[in-house]
């Protein structure tokens, strides 16, 4: 199991010299996250690779996943099955792992299953980033920037959503109309 995990980590781009540290962290994540080594390794490598992180960040990523599990109504096993579908989109728009974790905590805590949360968050990010969408038009009108440009310039996802909420409030619409 350990040797397979090391092989999987190295195959996914982790440095051979750091494989022992990586596998040790994956083992800890598997135990604390109610999952198996394969899922832990896959989730960690997917996250590190998508965000361009080095192996020295594996502990930070693992801690963030455990925190998401502890604060939300999800498990690392459920996150592991879903994150791979969302992280590429989030990374493309410069939405941080911290912001993704907060979104998962909020949605799962409110009774939305992890897989469904993934679909909702992914759709939201794509809608915000899609040229010509109502949300994109509002962001451009209010800031002169696209969603990607706002995220690249240091805005947080919460700040971007607040711009839309403010517009909804001032126009008497709901966020769903944005």
What are these regions (language model features)?
Residues 1-178:
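Amphipathic alpha-helical interface segments used for oligomerization, scaffolding
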């Amino acid at each position: 199991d350990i040797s397979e995990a090391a092989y999987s980590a190295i195959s996914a781009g982790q440095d051979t010299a750091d494989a022992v540290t990586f596998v040790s962290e994956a083992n800890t994540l598997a135990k604390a996250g109610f999952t198996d080594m394969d899922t832990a390794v896959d989730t960690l490598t997917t996250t590190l690779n998508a965000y361009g992180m080095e192996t020295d960040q594996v502990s930070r990523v693992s801690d963030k996943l455990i925190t998401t599990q502890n604060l939300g109504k999800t498990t690392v096993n459920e996150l592991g099955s879903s994150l791979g579908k969302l992280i590429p989109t989030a990374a493309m728009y410069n939405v941080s792992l911290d912001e993704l974790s907060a979104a998962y905590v909020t949605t799962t805590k409110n009774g939305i299953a992890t897989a469904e949360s993934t679909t909702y968050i992914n759709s939201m990010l794509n809608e915000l980033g899609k040229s010509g969408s109502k949300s994109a038009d509002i962001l451009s009108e209010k800031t002169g920037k696209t969603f990607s440009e706002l995220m690249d310039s240091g805005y947080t996802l919460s700040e971007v959503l607040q711009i839309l909420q403010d517009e909804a409030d001032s126009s008497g619409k709901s966020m769903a109309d944005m």
